[in-house]
């Protein structure tokens, strides 16, 4: 019996067969190309401005990406290359060969295991930064290793390492999930967002466009790009030029930059705007996660309300549903049309919302957690601060349903029940503890 068979929630509990090829898509239908190009130009200028004015980090002021200083010279040799090739080798006929960046992150772990379980080849890359406790990432790494996924420890800004990986493996696809996450932390460490979400993405695109053959790329954008948009539900064709946080701005910049590389170099690119992903093995900086921790410890939790005293609401999306969307995007991605940095024809460019399309007030989230934990929360109601958070999110998933076969199936209470079961096992040593 597999060590994953008794999981409270695992990639693989749902059907992960490949989505049939979509064919020729009208993939420019919702995109305003001129605005994307403008955003790409603006944020490339922002990045250059950052590079020029930023002083070199001193030993006492290292950012979260310390691991980016690790040279690719650390890697190589026959044993290392054997591990890389073995992990990336598909086990099924016609299987994909996928480089997953941010593989030991929340979404990256689930996607990597789902791909591996259906027979695809998967190679992980992660820098194990300290944005949250690296021990959680190391534990996820253990799951990946037991599933046959080798994770290279390195940074997406390390061009030498990336080129080495592309030399060793002919990747058919890249699932780019590495990023500096979190809305509020951007106010404390803005440089890390520019470094990872813009510079790191550009570095990956540079290496990918020079590859022969070029891989198709699916990358994580964010629902945060909708910013101050008040039209609901949020649709891919809605305006995204009013970001409410630096995190959102870097994600929007990524979309513009991706379009530029698609247009100039023929890279096949698909962006996925995730809406508040939650579930087992999640991120400790997310509300559902630290609410659970603080309720169990008897600490007061802060619940924000909108300026009109209404409840802040989120389109909470369970991790298994997000994984389905990621696999659907990979399976329907057309091949890139360039080779060795030269475009040979138009290439696919797509943007999709991946949400649950059922916004839930945060107050209801707390009520569900109280029920599952059998403890009453000590709540402090506060006005929503102007630190980048928005009052609500609501995804229109019509496009993803039609073109990716995306159908979210897990409601918030069911998903939180699975999360709490995992949390109690992982952090409290519950007898119901599972390998997930």
Curated annotation (Swiss-Prot):
Kindly indicate whether the keyword Thylakoid belongs to this entry: no
Q: Which keywords are on file for this protein?
A: Carbohydrate metabolism, Golgi apparatus, Isomerase, Membrane, NAD, Transmembrane, Transmembrane helix
| Pfam families documented for this protein | Epimerase (PF01370)
Q: Where does this polypeptide localize?
A: Golgi apparatus, Golgi stack membrane
| Source organism superkingdom | Eukaryota
The broad enzyme category this protein falls into is isomerase
How does the entry describe its membrane topology?
Answer: Multi-pass membrane protein
Question: Which family does the record assign?
Answer: Belongs to the NAD(P)-dependent epimerase/dehydratase family.
Task: State the oligomer form and interacting partners.
Answer: Homodimer.
Function according to Swiss-Prot or TrEMBL? Involved in the synthesis of the negatively charged monosaccharide that forms the backbone of pectic cell wall components.
Q: What is this protein called?
A: UDP-glucuronate 4-epimerase 5
* Protein source organism: Arabidopsis thaliana
Q: Which gene encodes it?
A: GAE5
């Amino acid at each position: 019996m597999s060590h994953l068979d008794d999981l409270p929630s695992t990639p693989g509990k749902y059907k992960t067969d490949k989505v049939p090829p979509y064919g020729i898509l009208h993939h420019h239908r919702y995109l305003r190309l001129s605005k994307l190009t403008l955003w790409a130009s603006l944020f490339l200028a922002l990045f250059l401005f950052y590079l020029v004015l930023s002083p070199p980090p001193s030993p006492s002021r290292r950012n979260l990406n310390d691991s980016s200083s690790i040279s690719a010279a650390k890697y190589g040799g026959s044993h290392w290359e054997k591990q890389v090739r073995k992990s990336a080798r598909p086990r099924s006929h016609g299987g994909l060969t996928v480089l997953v960046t941010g593989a030991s992150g929340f979404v990256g772990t689930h996607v990597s295991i789902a791909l591996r379980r259906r027979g695809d080849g998967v190679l992980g890359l992660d820098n194990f930064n300290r944005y949250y406790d690296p021990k959680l990432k190391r534990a996820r790494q253990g799951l990946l290793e037991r599933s046959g996924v080798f994770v290279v420890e390195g940074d997406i800004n390390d061009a030498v390492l990336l080129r080495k990986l592309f030399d060793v493996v002919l990747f058919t696809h890249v699932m780019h999930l590495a990023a500096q996450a979190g809305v509020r932390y951007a106010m404390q460490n803005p440089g890390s967002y520019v470094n990872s979400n813009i510079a790191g993405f550009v570095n990956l695109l540079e290496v990918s466009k020079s590859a022969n053959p070029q891989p198709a790329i699916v990358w994580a954008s964010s629902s945060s790009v909708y910013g101050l948009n008040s039209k609901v539900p949020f649709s891919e064709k809605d305006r995204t030029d009013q970001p409410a946080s630096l995190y959102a701005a870097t994600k929007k910049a990524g979309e513009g930059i991706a379009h530029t590389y698609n247009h100039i170099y023929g890279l096949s690119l698909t962006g996925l705007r995730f809406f508040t992903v939650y579930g087992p093995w999640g991120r400790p900086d997310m509300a559902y996660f630290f609410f659970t921790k603080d309720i169990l410890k008897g600490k007061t939790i802060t619940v924000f309300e909108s300026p009109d005293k209404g409840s802040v609401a989120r389109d909470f999306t369970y991790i298994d549903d997000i994984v389905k969307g990621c696999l659907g995007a990979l399976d329907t991605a057309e091949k890139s049309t360039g080779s060795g940095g030269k475009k040979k024809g138009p290439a696919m460019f797509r943007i999709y919302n991946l949400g649950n399309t059922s916004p839930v007030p945060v107050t209801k989230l707390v009520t569900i957690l109280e029920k599952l934990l059998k403890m009453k929360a000590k709540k402090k109601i506060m006005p929503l601060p102007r630190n980048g958070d928005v009052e609500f999110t609501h995804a229109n998933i019509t496009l993803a349903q039609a073109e990716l076969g995306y159908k979210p199936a897990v409601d918030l209470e069911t998903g939180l029940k699975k999360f709490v079961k995992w949390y109690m096992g992982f952090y409290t040593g519950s007898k119901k503890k599972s390998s997930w």
